[in-house]
Amino acid sequence: MTILEQMLEDTKSVAILGHIRPDGDCLGSTLGLYNYLRLNYPDIRAAVYLEESSPKFSYLKGYDTIRHQVDGECYELCVCLDSGDIQRLGDFKHYLDQADKSLCLDHHVTNTRYGGTNVVPDEASSTCEVLFDQLDEGKLDRYTAECLYTGIIHDTGVFKFSCTSAHTMEIAGKLMGKGIDFGAIIDNSFYRKTYIQNQILGRALLESITFFDGRCIFSAIRQSEMEFYGVDGKDMDGIIDQLRLTEGVEVAIFLYETGPQEFKVSMRSQYLVDVSRIAAFFGGGGHV
């Protein structure tokens, strides 16, 4: 019996949380757990609490049930997924504070082990990989598999990032065996962009600069530019990864303005630099 299964025993209600600005792994893991509970623990009252996210993930079952505001509900167990620290839970940390027990499932090397119980194997490719190992494979349906596969492809860059392991590929194969349309999931959630998203991506690439003999690349988008194109933070998805693919680049840095002189910073590296340590120094964290 896994740690998650032990904590679900005799539990009557579960709040499922992820991090602010939810991405593919966050949505995949939270909705994956939600669908698994609905199928295998029908007597448990469960709800997912997340900020608004990109509609490109609307194919995930349960997407339309996500709650975007703190309400008056109370839960016995709080499960936090893909969030390295309490602050990244945003306003929804309220449910962690009031729960009788809590579990943190994550894979980020910067995780602060803030849960009552923590499962954080930082060698895992994604939180969806961590979650898969906590579930009963035989009790997964296609909808849960779609969620988990979505998270894995997003945090592995469709299996090309260094975090991808043989175990990752083994899990992906098992999820494919559940009958998911893996090609459509990859195209619709990872590659396909709107015309406006392609425009802002092009702007970010056009305005980028390199330094340190071309080993670092930097780009930034101002709020005025975002207003001109009619985009928000959700439309910035994928820009940092495209910058990282520039030939000769080891570190990519991308900023977009969220308020007067306030910026959301994303960093990605190839192999030599651990950018998660830089992020942690400034109170952030995440992938290498």
Give residue ranges: language-model regions.
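Hydrophobic helix-and-loop "lid/oligomerization" segment in the mid-to-C-terminal part
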Residues: 2-20, 28-58, 68, 72-77, ...
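Short glycine-rich anion-binding loops that position phosphate/pyrophosphate groups of nucleotides
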Residues: 20-22, 83-86, 108-110, 223-224, ...
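Short glycine/serine/threonine-rich phosphate/pyrophosphate-binding segments
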Residues: 24-30, 86-90
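Glycine-rich, phosphate-binding/catalytic loops in enzymes
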Residues: 33-34, 95-98, 120-121, 170
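Active-site cofactor/cluster-binding pocket
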Residues: 61-117
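A generic local secondary-structure boundary/capping motif
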Residues: 68-69, 91-94, 118-121, 138-139, ...
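Solvent-exposed alpha-helices and their adjacent loops that cap or buttress functional pockets
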Residues: 71-72, 94-97, 111-112, 140-141, ...
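Short alpha-helices
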Residues: 105-171
